[in-house]
Amino acid sequence: MAEAHQASSLLSSLSSDGAEVELSSSVWQEIYLSALRSWKRNLWRVWNDFLAGVVPATPLSWLFLFSTIQLACLLQLDPSLGLMEKIKELLPDWGGQHHQLQGLLAAAVFASCLWGTLIFTLHVALRLLLSHHGWLLEPHGTMSSPTKTWLALVRIFSGRHPRLFSFQRALPRQPVPGAQETVRKYLESMRPVLRDDAFDSVVALANDFLRLQAPRLQLYLQLKSWCASNYVSDWWEEFVYLRSRGSLVNSTYYMMDFLYVTPTPLQAARAGNAVHTLLLYRHLLNRQEIPPTLLMGMRPLCSAQYERMFNTTRIPGVEKDYLCHLQDSQHVAVFHQGRFFRVGTHSSNGLLSPRALEQQFQYILDDPSPACPLEEHLAALTAAPRSMWAQVRESVKTHAATALETVEGAAFFVSLDSEPAGLTRENPAASLDTYAHTLLTGQGHDRWFDKSFTLIVFSNGKLGLSVEHSWADCPVAGHLWEFTLATECFQLGYATDGHCKGHPDPALPKPQRLQWDLPKQIQPSISLALRGAKTLSGNIDCHVFPFFHFGKSFIKGCHVSSDSFIQLVLQLAHFRDRGQFCLTYESAMTRLFLEGRTETVRSCTREACQFVRAMENKERTDQQCLALFREAVDKHQALLKAAMSGQGIDRHLFALYIMSRLLHMQSPFLTQVQSQQWLLSTSQIPVQQTHLFDVHNYPDYVSSGGGFGPAHDHGYGVSYIFMGENAISFHISSKQSSTETDSHRLGQHIEDALLDVASLFQAGQQFKRQFTGLGESSGWKYSNLSCKTVDPNIPKSSTNL
């Protein structure tokens, strides 16, 4: 098989005595280097875990403590109050000549015990500090004296240079809300979207639930919260993602490249820099040298989702998938024009340079060999229903185990697409829509959807990222993507001719072509999967539009939360689009807690509906609408803060539902809750998490974010990102098959709603619509649309990577 890239070093010959195997020196060298890398990696992992575990202390603090104890002993003082003498008695008797050594060992043991006790005390104190969420409830943009004191203590107990996983032992566990309060909030959220008779029916079911099932379910859930790291996250991963039997196309999300700039038009060069940067990130991740994410620059978030970022594959099962995570991987799997390749990422000198990786990718692009039978569309199986793929995978594993293991064991998947993508001068609107659609679905057979993420490199040098959702949520993948774009462009850079910097390596082994010896019996399954994938892809309606009339700076000037501002705009736009209110899903993170993931903010509140109705009522004045707008913003902020502090609605009800199923309890109320449909699913894409470069100094280097598919056949998926201070980008998705939705129509309503809401803050001066769709007056900077090579002398970020 092609997996054996050192086959030329393994010489086999037959003699009369049987088979003889001669191992050449290069094989022994490779075995030695592999073992050395493994030992070094394991030692680094142990050392980094140790450093993360003792934060805020350091090994130097132990040395200082030990030296202080020794100094006290020299001064004939006993800081241990007799404990060191007890320790000496427990040590072996080595004779009088080793009395001094016994004293040193006793002092070291006492110093270690005292040091460990101090660290434990600091961890307990830090956990108590991090359990405080009162700062979340303060008015937007203000900080009271108690909060300032709390923040100062958090910084003191956090240490000077915390590592990525330093806070994991100190993070509090996610609390289980009270059942009465959760049900009350749920009924409050349902009131705006239900008729009176339907609402009365839900109230009756809720009362029965609180009286009959809630006490027992709540008790068991409390017991689980005491025993598990998080009372809901493991069930969320299993039942929402891994037990889902639908296509992964429905749950993936994507991220885009820079909007205006393409650093190089050379596909292989961009792939080389990007892959090198991603593996640099993995190196920093393994050594825990990535700083932990701090909310508002002060409160650490859980970093557990980073652990399965690389070397991870979702393996299909008949009833349930599972995530296979490897400790390390020394290659990436590459797909190009129906063919699979293995590209090694390391040599005896470590990680390959960007120029060496470019050389490997260029070889693949230049390779004229055709795809093997059944190979071209094989990846369509990963887009098939999971149970079907699980059954076919057994046959693939039997006949092409080496190739399958190579793909599933890769650090990540790389797709070298044959078409260009990105913003174009000729048709900016349509080009962005096509770009988003390609990132979300591909052609149905050119993405290995099981991998944790797929790096997509287009023929004109544009990049994109497609992410499988089960292992992590958008902010974690977004952190990786920000690092990748900033580092490969600003830190690594490109030569003046567009190639990666450095020199090719003529001695580098060529990429290995994977061989798929597949039986013809799986041809119908591949064809069926391909038809299904193309049907799913063709049914997705994607629309991306940047809005340039104003952005975050203007919203800040209105003294309201930017996220709440957009959420109310979406409520107004959706009402104009559908003529009714609906359940709205906004994703909020719960990473303030250990292994926290997300919670739902139900943005369609009574206050939001009152504001929307006022905006549609010509008899209401701007002052009245503005007052209702501020009430709706305050309500949304309260819901968002409650969700972030573990007092949300939906994850608690979800956990109660799973517990009822495990206990074989029938709850019509919980069944009704879980059957509700989210017709509007929204999310804000985080930006500037890494601070590797200042987007204000380089306004052309903004990304238009990313998006996801709709959660319902007749619903919308809407994501948004603030591009700098003066622009907002929206990604809208819906189903072509629905007669009730239209992504472009909703986009126009969002644009109108943004202008109408902004006009409320202009003291009677209306924002004038300057364009319909995307035209020259919309603020598009046509001078920046070219995909030319970036000036290699561009100023670099001051951040030391």
Swiss-Prot record:
Its main location: other. It is found in: Synapse; Cell projection, Dendrite; Cell projection, Axon; Endoplasmic reticulum membrane. It comes from Rattus norvegicus (Rat). It comes from the Eukaryota. Its EC number is 3.1.2.22. Peripherally associated with AMPAR complex. AMPAR complex consists of an inner core made of 4 pore-forming GluA/GRIA proteins (GRIA1, GRIA2, GRIA3 and GRIA4) and 4 major auxiliary subunits arranged in a twofold symmetry. One of the two pairs of distinct binding sites is occupied either by CNIH2, CNIH3 or CACNG2, CACNG3. The other harbors CACNG2, CACNG3, CACNG4, CACNG8 or GSG1L. This inner core of AMPAR complex is complemented by outer core constituents binding directly to the GluA/GRIA proteins at sites distinct from the interaction sites of the inner core constituents. One of its GO terms (molecular function) is carnitine O-palmitoyltransferase activity. Residues 71-103 are mitochondrial intermembrane. This is Palmitoyl thioesterase CPT1C.
